[in-house]
Amino acid sequence: SIISHREEIFNDKQSLFGKLFGILILFLLVAPGVISNESAKTSIAPLMLWVFLWIGVPVLGLLFGDIYAKFNPLNLFPVSSNKPQSVYFACVLFIGLTWFELVWRKPGNPLNIGVVFMLLFISVNLLRYFLKKSLIEVDPLLLLHYLYSKLKLINSRPYFRSLLDNIGNLARLRGIEYFVLLMIG
């Protein structure tokens, strides 16, 4: 039998700087479309979403660990929650984000990006507040970036050993296999 180190699944504490950066990110995603209705060619919202959040942060997470959790724009309010049990809500919200990206007409439109992120922000925080869910159970972007960070390329321990430990720790969350399949698909 192999005894492996078990770590805390997730800690959602943010520094003041992280919260301020998260507010800035949320503002840059929502304001250009909702407040000023900028065109997609001149707006920063599509750049923030498609280049920074979908590509840049996961690549940085592969190198430096879970940096998205440090400034998560959906984690602005402190909410007491239970220990993470499942990620089914995150799976459903991830399907919604994927539908927005692949099916919805004009996913690069700043107004559409603003509306989607306002809905995501409200959904995540209502689930956290009323159902006492932990952030990693309901935030699909956090779970996505967290999974990428668990594949971290730079480790002080042997790579495959730490990768197996990380995967073993994640297996305790019900529904994680569905989220991984959605992520791959």
Regions found by a protein language model. Name each.
Residues S1-G185:
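Transmembrane-helix bundle segments that line or gate the permeation/cavity pathway
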